[in-house]
């Protein structure tokens, strides 16, 4: 029996952060899920996955994440989900270089899962479509499909109805207050506003951007409130997702860096530019065209 085809060698893949430039909660369904309207944009900053496909049939991941069992790790779950969906006999060694915080609202875990799906679909030559990868991703998390598709998007429904958009690619100063916030804790909070009127995209893009989770997060987490109040002195600033990260927007890298330089040394923060095409999609295209090659 012939060995399954695969791309040999070691490959390196970006796992970019995202921002919710706005986030509105327009209702709550009987199953507890929320109807949203949100605008996703990627950043040119994130984690990195080094992946080598092999014939072992096993998925190895290093380093192990503290307090997260391998079977619960989204990277492992994504690899196994693709393996099962494509009925692939292949395996992979995956190394994660982690810089994005967990519980930060910038998509760290969802982005890792999406990068795993996109990379292994290529390396294992499984040939699944973008729609199929998005469907697998949705079972892993509501934000995974936007990362697998790789385009800035306006999302509706529970976040799965995506329309490609091209917001301005501004510069952002992203600050991580010293607290991790579980999405579930915010979406189940009794004081969360859930009745924002649904609007069309044109209206949303021409009104000041807001985040319906921001008020409750600021009241529950003084660290977030303090950091956001500080940023608002310098530029339009908001919470992303359910936090804990907050961001300020600027028209130039120079302006963002100037405010970054004023932060205390013990504050976790970075400056990045918005990207309407994900660095992941660009890397995939570069591998497919042999612009970059495995080593």
UniProtKB/Swiss-Prot annotation:
Gene3D superfamilies, sorted: 3.30.230.10, GHMP kinase, C-terminal domain (3.30.70.890)
Task: Give the EC number.
Answer: 2.7.1.148
Is Kinase one of the keywords? yes
Pathway per its UniProt entry is: Isoprenoid biosynthesis; isopentenyl diphosphate biosynthesis via DXP pathway; isopentenyl diphosphate from 1-deoxy-D-xylulose 5-phosphate: step 3/6
Per the UniProt entry, the signal peptide is: none
Q: Catalytic activity annotated for this protein? A: 4-CDP-2-C-methyl-D-erythritol + ATP = 4-CDP-2-C-methyl-D-erythritol 2-phosphate + ADP + H(+)
Q: Which organism is it from?
A: Vibrio cholerae serotype O1 (strain ATCC 39315 / El Tor Inaba N16961)
What protein am I looking at?
4-diphosphocytidyl-2-C-methyl-D-erythritol kinase
- Please tell me whether the keyword Transferase is annotated for this protein: yes
Q: Which domain of life is it from?
A: Bacteria
One Pfam family named in its UniProt record: GHMP_kinases_N
- Provide the family line: Belongs to the GHMP kinase family. IspE subfamily.
Gene Ontology molecular functions: 4-(cytidine 5'-diphospho)-2-C-methyl-D-erythritol kinase activity; ATP binding
Which GO biological process annotations does it have? isopentenyl diphosphate biosynthetic process, methylerythritol 4-phosphate pathway; terpenoid biosynthetic process
- Give the protein's biological function: Catalyzes the phosphorylation of the position 2 hydroxy group of 4-diphosphocytidyl-2C-methyl-D-erythritol.
